[in-house]
Structures are given as structure tokens and as C-alpha cells.
Amino acid sequence: MPSTTFDHLPTAKQDRVTAALLTEFSAHSLADAQVARIVASADIARGAFYKYFDNLTDAYQYLYHVALREIHRDAGGDERTTFDAERIYQGVVDFVDQVNDSQYYAFIRRHYAENESLLPAAPVSSRLPAIAWAAMVLSHAAIKEILLEPTSEATVRERLRTTLALLQQKED
């Protein structure tokens, strides 16, 4: 994640760096990304990049968190703890719609297609109930499939809704 130096930059400069990251990581995989293109686009010194981020992976993860925070906010993310199949289904639909309509579409699509496997797996709490874990895994798989193969969206959505309903029956 970014350093405190980055956090204390004027908002306009943070936005410029973030926009340069989005341009780079939307056009190039993490493996092919270059600091040189980022610093040229952001109009910052190469040394400044390394004051803001440890490396390209750190910068990528920062941008990924920014994108998810914005997309989840616009998709109306819900943090309820009770299992509700329809709410989870609608959250996936809203998330996909927000990604499709956002500046992050190419970045998120490339994340699933090329970059996800290059990053460390996010830890999942061992206290997460099995049904919540199943819904989470299923939802993320559905999002990935829809974004990578948009023509399959209707089929994936129906399969997701059906499976979540089965999980709901198990929960009730």
C-alpha cells in the first residue's frame, strides 16, 4: 500500500499518479508493466515512485483497492451478516454493472485474465461461516466468468441465482 509520503501529497498529484497507474495496468499485465511509463505519464521522478510504493506490485494492489472501494460503493455494498441469497445475487449483478460502466473495466478484466494469479491470496477468516464462504467463492467465480466471457452473462447469472437459492434452503 502507498507510503505516508503518498498519503500526504496534494489530492491533484495523488489523482495524477493514480490515473497513470490505471492507464498502465489497464494496458499491460503486472508482469509487463513498467515504472518508466508510469512516471512519464504521472510526470514524476522515478525516485518519487519508489517513495510512494515499494514496487510495481505494491502500486498495483493500491490501485486494485481504490477500484474495488469505488465500485463497491457505487454498487451499494452491504455488510449484513445474515445469509440472504437474493441480496448476494443482486450484489453480484450490481458489481458487474458498475465494473462495466466504470473507468476500471479494462483494469478489472485484466486482473482476472492475467494478474490475479500473480498476487498473494487474500486471507479469509477461519471464523467465516461455511455458507458465507461458499457464497463468496461462488460470487467471485461468477464475476470472473462474466467479465472474461460477457456472452455467458445470462447463463452465469441464472446458475448463480439457482445455486444461491439452494444455499439459502440449506441455511433456513
Give the residues covered by each predicted segment.
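Basic, helix-initiating cap at the start of DNA-binding domains
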Residues: 1-24, 37
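Alpha-helical DNA-contacting segments of helix-turn-helix folds
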Residues: 16, 53, 57-70, 106-115
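Ser/Thr-centered, proline-biased regulatory motifs
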Residues: 31-37
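Secondary-structure edge/capping motif, primarily at the C-terminal ends of alpha-helices
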Residues: 75-79, 106, 146-150
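Hydrophobic/aromatic-rich alpha-helical bundle segments in the mid-to-C-terminal region
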Residues: 122-172
